Each structure stands twice: as C-alpha cells, then as structure tokens.
Amino acid sequence: MSLAGKTLFITGASRGIGKAIALRAARDGANVIVAAKTDKPHPRLPGTVHSAVDEIDAAGGTGMACVVDIRFEEQVEEAVGRTAEKFGGIDILVNNASAIFLAGTLDTPMKRFDLMHQVNVRGTYLCSQKCLPHLLSASNAHILNISPPLTMEQQWFAPHVAYTMAKYGMSQCVLGMSAEFKSKQIAVNALWPRTAIATAAVQNLLGGAEAMRCCRKPEIMADAAHWILTQDSSSCTGNFFVDDDVLQTAGITNLDQYAIDPTAELMPDFFL
C-alpha cells in the first residue's frame, strides 16, 4: 500500500518523529504539510519547517511549510485552510506535536502544566476538529496521535503527574473520536514507541549522548505509522499501537536496523 497522492497534515514535523513520518510519506509521493513553530534555526533544536520541506521535496514528495502554534485556533484554521486550498483537501492528520516537562507536582510550575495541556490535549483536539470536515470527504481518512496506551498505572503518574495527564489526554481523544467517527469510516489510532527514540528531547532532557546510544531511530516510528496509515480506515480504528508490534505484523523482523547502537541496551519508553 502507498500514500502516493495523499495529503498529510503533520504537527511538529520540523524534526524528530514528525519529520521521519513526513519523509516516509514523501518517499511514496505524498503531499506533506509541516505544521510547526520553528521558522528560524534554534541553537539546541536543529531543523525548521523550511528545511523539513526541502527534505520532503528531495525525497519525492511535495512539501508545504506552515508556521503554526497549535495552541491558537486562528493559526490552526489558517494552516488547515491553506492546505485544503493548495491540495484540494486533507486525507491524514498526524498529531505529533507535544510538550514535555518531567517533574513532580511540587516542582511543576503552572505555566509548564498549562503549556503541556494546551499543546498536547487542546492542540490535538483543535487540529482534529479543524481537519475533520476535510477528512469526512476524504478516501481512507486517518487520524494518528503519537500517544501511549491508556494503561492508567500509578507508576506512570507518580514521577510526572502533569505530563502523564497531558499525554493520556491525547490518548483519550483516540478513545472517543474513534467511536464517534467510526460510522464515517475515519480511522483514529494512537502509536507509541516501545523504547526511547533518538530525538532532541531525549538528548536534552534524558541524558545526552549516552542516552542516545540506548535509543532507536525515529524511522521505526515512521515505518510503523506508514503501515497504520495505509490500512483500511473502516476497520483499523480505535487501536493503541506500539511500534515494534506493528512492524512484526507488517513482517519486519530485523529491528536492529533501527538501533542507534546495536550493542547498547535499549532504554524502555514511558507508559509501557
């Protein structure tokens, strides 16, 4: 199955997992909207919406940069409108953008709490709401949230209550919207990595270069997302997928190809 000719609106696609998903779709010849905040290079976070579009075009897709902060309704409306005007609609939404702050209750400033909920929960809901009118008229429409299974175990709440609440809020969107739009044949699923993924967040927050050795590459999430997004939207919905389980189903058994360092012990991700 291919995403050729499909139009994907991907939030947070200027780097990391979002960009990897974008580039995998581009290899099929998809139209890919890079919806992210980074207009100019950041000293600690490589990549902008413009550099991502250059890579998408080079990979065989058609990219479009949308500088957008998904906390703001007007900005999302404008980005979605521009996308529909240029490409004639939207087939797939990937809610990848996310804010993270790993601290306990007493050490989490309310501005951090607010940011995580505005980006992770409200942003996911808002982007879904604005894209849905276009998805309703699309063929094999999908929404994919990069969020964890709803295990609801105390061990995942205790160290960082606010972050867990915000990520589970994204997953609750899957739980509700998959049922709400099943009759309309819009698939709504979640995808989460089994292990830590080599992104700027891991490098900056979880231990630098040593932590990166224990990660898998973002391409494992991209390949898993590609499989999900090419499934029949009328039946493949309401799932909380884990990347390596998806690849096993897809017949990909060599997971060493995704390791940053195949000799290093992999770092498990949160929530699993």
Language model features by range: what are they?
Residues 136, 142-183, 192-197:
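Catalytic loop of short-chain dehydrogenase/reductase
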Residues 25, 89, 171-174, 181-193, ...:
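Conserved Rossmann-fold SDR core element
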Residues 190-191, 208-272:
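C-terminal helical subdomain
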Residues 6, 61-62, 89-90, 135-149, ...:
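Active-site loop of short-chain dehydrogenase/reductase
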Residues 2-87, 101, 111:
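Short-chain dehydrogenase/reductase
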Residues 104-105, 109-114:
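Substrate-binding pocket helix/loop in short-chain dehydrogenase/reductase
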Residues 128-129, 175:
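A short, exposed helix-loop element centered on a Lys and neighboring polar residues
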